[in-house]
Amino acid sequence: MLYSIGKVVQTHGIKGEVKIKPHTDFDRFVKGFDVIIKDTKYKIQTVREQKDLLLVSFVGYPTLTDVEHLKQQEIYTDEEPLDLESDAFHLPKLIGLKVYDQHNYLIGTVLELVDVPQGYLLRILRDDNGKTVLIPFIDKFIKSVDETSIHIETIEGLI
């Protein structure tokens, strides 16, 4: 089974580096680690941080031309997810979870995670009217996450 761990958002420079937006709260991007992009395995050669992104190069791909085709591609691993701390989770596992407000009222179901420069938004299909809403995935709104549901704190105009 494959597990999504990030996305190549852009190339960087001329020496075969790519910018990666990780989907995980823990470090999967280390030298020597194998990742899968478009059904091909790549071994990580170097990793360095740049703001909320990682700059990564792969063994055997030394030029911009070598990595150009990786732009906007999801990155996977075939290794089991690591055990997480109690306040961490695997972002792809949020899809399909039920979302409740602070009064335990069912708002809807998570359809997808939208990656924006500020972080992630949850696209939720509303249970009451079939419309979708976007909720910022930040501590101000997300109060708890478990294996079956997400509880949020709503404010006027959020939903």
Curated annotation (Swiss-Prot):
One of its GO terms (molecular function) is ribosome binding. GO terms for biological process: ribosomal small subunit biogenesis; rRNA processing. Its main location: cytoplasm. It comes from the Bacteria. The keyword rRNA processing applies. It is found in: Cytoplasm. Keywords: Chaperone, Cytoplasm, Ribosome biogenesis, rRNA processing. PANTHER family: RIBOSOME MATURATION FACTOR RIMM. An accessory protein needed during the final step in the assembly of 30S ribosomal subunit, possibly for assembly of the head region. Essential for efficient processing of 16S rRNA. May be needed both before and after RbfA during the maturation of 16S rRNA. It has affinity for free ribosomal 30S subunits but not for 70S ribosomes. Belongs to the RimM family. The PRC barrel domain binds ribosomal protein uS19. This is Ribosome maturation factor RimM. It comes from Acholeplasma laidlawii (strain PG-8A).
